[in-house]
């Protein structure tokens, strides 16, 4: 009799799981049949007027080749091969959708300058549940512009000047606590900690370590779920992400309610951080943002500002380690700023604006390794472009990889040459350099990211005389959508042999 217990257990588990199994089977069938019908329909449609190219295999199109190119750092080759065969406008099929890729500045302009005219942002509903259906990413038209106006109350250059001291102190404390005193560190790990600390401090004024760590843990789970298979069942990444989003909402809701009380009682000011700015914002009609809009936008901002900034900052340090002459120019620029300060003087907006060469280094890093791969749009009408028709409902893709590494737009594009961005020289042609996107949906927080990278480099130079990579041959890889040094980029640190301050005057060394 005992020998049948395993069988009974298996049957019981099957009966218990049957609804879930049935759901998966039906979803699989639908996932096969519906794309097949769409694929056959697209094949039957007259090809006259459509851009040249190939849709690949049924169901998967060229998605696997595309993802392989992302993970193997061969995106440029993936695109170049198709441009060579079909030209600067070609069709393919990516992530289950017929897609037209537009290459070059003219194609970039068509997509980025025609939001809500010819194209609109398009994300899967499953992703929007995690990113926020009332976030700036999901909003369109007037709703998008209202949220953008709210964000500009914090992210505009004029507003950011108020937060330089707070950001600078957060960075200085982080370097003193987690970098200084260590002979060797992992740059990617510590930069990740730093970027999240800055966001937690300036977005919510959260200073407690355990609260920051809990937020970070939830955001990591959500980030994995955004592009996961959208199955809301135990054991699936998407299910875990939905649960994490619910917990994140509970934490943020508590912060919102407390801040409302603090604002009412005078314990908080209207501009002390992004949360206060959001809560006190009113549109042209005098309407405030709803709590749901604030929740959704904070979730999206925390995720969006983290990955891209960590990528950019880590790659800046990696490229400076490989180009000592450029690093020396950065050092001299930063020490020049310090030489004009007395001990205890804070960094000012004028100081940040004077970090011209350091900013050129960041720009050149983003040209070589853009933090965003590009983005998809959906055609909201038939689009006539370069003699072709892009049908309504098709996806369009723009990517900086069609201009950033090209000789026709940047001389010697394979070289790390920060001076190419010297604004006193030749200006970069429009729609060729797009590290922050463009048009209505350009990154609203790019000035914030610029400031935190420049201030981080400043405090690093102030603390360390130099650094050397443990593995100079380590590459920058795009294993995820954001490029990062492949093994965390461990470096040996060499602190300055004595303080930059002698008496009250900063000493240049």
Curated annotation (Swiss-Prot):
Residues holding heme: 443
Keyword set, alphabetical order: Endoplasmic reticulum, Heme, Iron, Membrane, Metal-binding, Microsome, Monooxygenase, NADP, Oxidoreductase, Taxol biosynthesis, Transmembrane, Transmembrane helix
Coiled coil: none
Regions crossing the membrane: 20-40, 186-206, 218-238
Domain of life the protein comes from: Eukaryota
Matches recorded under PROSITE patterns: CYTOCHROME_P450
Enzyme Commission number: 1.14.13.146
Record field: catalytic activity: 10beta-hydroxytaxa-4(20),11-dien-5alpha-yl acetate + NADPH + O2 + H(+) = 10beta,14beta-dihydroxytaxa-4(20),11-dien-5alpha-yl acetate + NADP(+) + H2O
Entry-linked CDD domains: CYP90-like
GO CC annotation: endoplasmic reticulum; intracellular membrane-bounded organelle; membrane
Pathway membership, UniProt: Alkaloid biosynthesis; taxol biosynthesis
Compartment annotation: Microsome membrane
SUPFAM superfamilies hit by this protein: Cytochrome P450
pH dependence: Optimum pH is 7.5.
GO molecular function list: heme binding; iron ion binding; taxoid 14-beta-hydroxylase activity
Membrane topology label: Multi-pass membrane protein
Single GO BP term: sterol metabolic process
Pfam families with a match to the protein in the record: p450
Keyword Cytoplasm: no
EC class name: oxidoreductase
Family: Belongs to the cytochrome P450 family.
Role summary: Catalyzes the conversion of 5-alpha-acetoxy-10beta-ol to 5-alpha-acetoxy-10beta,14beta-dihydroxy taxadiene. Also acts on taxa-4(20),11-dien-5-alpha-yl acetate.
Protein name according to UniProt: Taxoid 14-beta-hydroxylase
Organism: Taxus cuspidata (Japanese yew)
